[in-house]
Amino acid sequence: LSNCHCLVHIDKITIKKTMLTMIEEKYMRRALQLARMGRGSVSPNPMVGAVITAQGRIIGEGYHRKYGGPHAEVNAINSVSGEDRHLLKESTIYVTLEPCSHYGKTPPCSKLIIDSNIPNVVIGTEDPFKEVSGRGINMLKEAGINVITGVLKKECDELNCHFMTAHRLLRPYILLKWAESADHYIDRIRDIKEKPTVFSTKITSTLVHKLRSEYDAIMVGARTAKLDNPSLTVRDWSGRNPKRIVVGRKNFTLEGS
C-alpha cells in the first residue's frame, strides 16, 4: 500500500509539472507571435515579445516595435490597465529573450521588472550580447524573483538567428539565394544587351522581397551588377531597403547608389 501511495504521489507531481510546462509554452508561443511583429523594424536589435499573466489570464503584452524604441517588457508592462495594475505583484512575465541589464538607448528592463514587483519571470533564451549575457537573469534572481529559463529555447533562438549568429559566432548570418530550373539551368553567358533568363513567378518574387525586408544587406557579384544593375529594393512587401553590396576585383558603383 505504501508503494502504491508513493506512485500516486509521484504521478501527481509529474502531472503538475507537465501542466506547468504546457502553460509556460502556451504563453511563450504568444510572446513569439508578438515578437515576429517587429520583423524588419528592429535590426540590429533582436525581435522580442513579452506577455504578462495573472490569475490565469493575460493582463498585458507587448513587443519591440522599432530600433531605439521601448523594449518588449516596457510595452507589456505599460499595456496593463489601471484596474489590473495591482495584479503585477502576483504576475508572471514571459519574455522570448533575457531582459537587458544595461543602460543603452533605453534603461534596463530587468530593473523595470524588479521595480514593477513582478515575482515570476519565464525566459525563452539567454541574450548573447556581451553587455547582457546572463547579467539580466542574475539581476532578477538577486532581487528574489523566481526565474525560469529555456522555455521553447529552440524556437526563440531561431526567431533571432541573425542576432544570435552575430553575437555567438561573431560573423553575419548569410543566406544564399538563386533561381534555377528543375534541370539546374540558371542562365546562359550573355552580354549587357541580352535580357536574363527569368524563373521567378509572382509568388516567388513576393517571397524574395519579404526576405529582402528581413536582411540588412544584399550582396551581388560585379558581373550581375554590370549586366542587370538590380535595384535590390523592397517593393512587393513592406519594410526597409537593405544596403547594396557589390563584390568584384575593382571598385564598382551601382547606378543610383
Walk through the language-model features, giving the residues of each.
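Cysteine-centered motifs
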Residues: 4-6
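Zinc-dependent deaminase
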Residues: 12-41, 58, 84-85, 103-257
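A structural motif shared across PLP-dependent enzymes of the aminotransferase-like
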Residues: 40-43, 47, 68-71
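Short beta-strand scaffold segments in enzyme catalytic cores
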Residues: 48-56, 178-179
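Short glycine-/small-residue motifs
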Residues: 61
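A short, polar/charged loop-to-alpha-helix boundary motif
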Residues: 65-78, 199-205
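Mobile, glycine- and charge-enriched loop segments
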Residues: 77-103, 253-254
